[in-house]
Design a protein with these regions (language model features):
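Basic polycationic patches enriched in arginine
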Residues: 4-5
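Histidine-acidic metal/acid-base catalytic patches
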Residues: 8-25, 31-41, 45-57, 68-80, ...
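Active-site acidic/histidine proton-transfer and metal-coordination neighborhood
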Residues: 34-40, 52, 72, 78, ...
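Hydrophobic faces of well-ordered beta-strands that scaffold small-molecule active sites
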Residues: 56-62, 85-87, 118-122, 146-148, ...
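Active-site beta-loop-alpha junctions enriched in small/polar residues
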Residues: 61-65, 88-90, 123-126, 151-152, ...
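Glycine-rich, proline-tolerant flexible connector loops at the mouths of alpha/beta enzymes
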Residues: 87-106, 156
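Vicinal oxygen chelate
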Residues: 90-92, 97, 124, 255-262
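A short acidic, helix-capping loop that chelates divalent metal ions and anchors anionic groups
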Residues: 92-96, 154-159, 225, 298-303
């Protein structure tokens, strides 16, 4: 039986016909597939996926839950189909601060209680040159990645951009060396109005970096909303893709909107078709985390009123992405 929540999700998912260069899915066919997937639930999607060598590996971003108690967030991670947590600080959340308040030992105990592992410490507040202390904390608590934005002039193009990216990598080398020593990966997000904010900048970062301990945390939100372009960016950088945000522009995230419009940042709710994107992830055999993501307005609040509702939205996106992947699989010859 389809729940009322699933019925509402289905109406949103079926609101537009999905078309790509890879295949065309008409509204009726897509909706019928989605009905079957929703009735079966995530378990059936996972079963069909198990037959394939490629799977999306999910991580939960704590900022999706705003400033809720960390225990309430950790209790939802497994329900959201994940095993790892990405911890965010103020002003998007305050879970990094909550860890310091409770102490590292208590945090480790709560992780164990809920059978969750630390994956990432996100720190746009510190910037890429201020992450070494957090690398040590991540290592101590079992994490393997820190994420930040880039530093350098924005709005550059051509050779000026290439030179600035090369200079940024040179400045990052001591931090890359520290990351290598600790076994921590540094993810740099492509963020609007920053040095690394375009496909060219992303490709040059991938070209100039040793990749293993520094790579791109790719945010489709901050790129042109062209799934084929985003897919090409993914295949171009290959194993320099270290993190993927399942996130689109939708109606944006800078002004207060009705909730249903705000949620259009989520894959499956907005207009962008993610089939070419997951196809590209499969093509490069992407093994990093996929983080279902959006920004609420104002920052620091949960994307939905309750933790269970936040998790439901995350699972709706997971169902959509798995359906996109199944469409890619169906078109691939055995």
């Amino acid at each position: 039986m389809i729940t009322r929540r699933q019925e509402l999700d289905m109406k949103i998912f079926c609101s537009e016909q999905i078309q790509t260069d890879y295949l065309q899915i008409g509204r009726r066919e897509f909706c019928m597939s989605l009905i079957a997937a929703l009735v079966a639930g995530p378990a059936k999607l996972a079963v069909s996926h198990d037959a394939q060598t490629f799977q999306l590996r999910y991580i939960v971003g704590s900022s999706m839950y705003g400033r809720m108690a960390l225990t309430d967030v950790l209790s939802e991670v497994r329900n959201a189909g994940a095993q790892h947590i990405d911890i965010w600080p103020e002003h998007h959340a305050n879970h990094r601060e909550q860890i310091e308040t409770m102490g590292h030992e208590q945090f480790a105990a709560i992780l164990k209680q809920y059978q969750v592992e630390l994956g990432i410490l996100t720190h746009y507040d510190l910037g890429p040159f201020g992450l070494q202390d957090e690398m040590r904390v991540a290592k101590k608590l079992g994490g393997s990645m820190v994420i930040s934005g880039s530093r350098g002039p924005g709005n550059l193009k051509g050779q000026a951009l290439k030179a600035a990216v090369r200079e940024f990598i040179e400045k990052m080398k001591p931090h890359i060396a520290a990351a290598e020593q600790m076994g921590i990966t540094i993810g740099i997000e492509n963020h609007a109005n920053s040095l690394i904010d375009s496909p060219d900048a992303i490709r040059w970062l991938a070209e100039f970096t040793p990749c293993r301990y520094l790579g791109i945390a790719l945010s489709p939100y901050h790129l042109a909303q062209d799934p084929v372009l985003i897919a090409k960016c993914i295949t171009d950088i290959g194993n320099c893709l270290v993190h993927f945000y399942a996130w689109q522009y939708g109606q944006g995230c800078h002004k207060k909107l009705p909730k249903q419009l705000e949620l259009m940042q989520l894959p499956g709710r907005g207009e962008m078709n993610f089939v070419p994107i997951v196809t590209a992830l499969k093509k490069i055999n992407y093994s990093g985390w996929t983080e279902v993501f959006m920004h609420p307005v104002p920052r620091g609040i949960p994307i939905m009123p309750t933790a269970a509702e936040v998790t439901s939205e995350i699972n709706g996106v997971r169902n959509y992405l798995e359906l996109c992947l199944s469409r890619e699989i169906e078109r691939t010859p055995a």
